Amino acid sequence: MATVEPETTPTTNPPPAEEEKTESNQEVANPEHYIKHPLQNRWALWFFKNDKSKTWQANLRLISKFDTVEDFWALYNHIQLSSNLMPGCDYSLFKDGIEPMWEDEKNKRGGRWLITLNKQQRRSDLDRFWLETLLCLIGESFDDYSDDVCGAVVNVRAKGDKIAIWTTECENRDAVTHIGRVYKERLGLPPKIVIGYQSHADTATKSGSTTKNRFVV
């Protein structure tokens, strides 16, 4: 004769387990909304407006400092694009503690990789090149030589705009040339385009309109 299996009484354990699972998932997911991604360095963004009635230093203004990826994008998306600035204005991004001037202790023995743009490039290349420059800096894109980087400057000028990465020691050939090669590659410049590195001392004492290049890539 067939036997009837005894009915099993349902356990009350599964629902709490489901609740725990849900709570656990929430605990894992939620912190992503609050955790910011730290940068290796703290950076300061400066703005320069050429008001001839004021001293050079009075025209230089600190906009903000940041040390996370999210705070960088919040700042970048809030300010005017370089291509919309009035001629005579600059943006500078430097490591916190370094001022965007040749006389700063970290800059005075250094120099810059200089990108010179023609008037037509303000519309086509300026903003793209400047953003890529910023990302190179905050992303520490120059490998072991990123410590040699002090900052970068974009000069908006009627005759043609300029972008430059500043390094701390112009005599450090290995660091300077590596930074130049990586920078040129990141900007997507073709091999036939040559960019030059000039020391700040040479730029400050130049007799003509151009400064001699210490290095080229």
Curated annotation (Swiss-Prot):
Pfam families: IF4E (PF01652). Keywords: Acetylation, Cytoplasm, Initiation factor, mRNA transport, Nucleus, Phosphoprotein, Protein biosynthesis, RNA-binding, Translation regulation, Transport. Residues 37-40, 73-77, 132-139 are annotated as: EIF4EBP1/2/3 binding. Changing W73A: Binding to CYFIP1 reduced by 70%. Does not affect mRNA nuclear export or nuclear pore complex reprogramming. Does not affect affinity for mRNA cap. Reduces interaction with LRPPRC. Reduces affinity for PML and viral Z protein. PROSITE patterns: IF4E (PS00813). Belongs to the eukaryotic initiation factor 4E family. This is Eukaryotic translation initiation factor 4E. It comes from Mus musculus (Mouse).
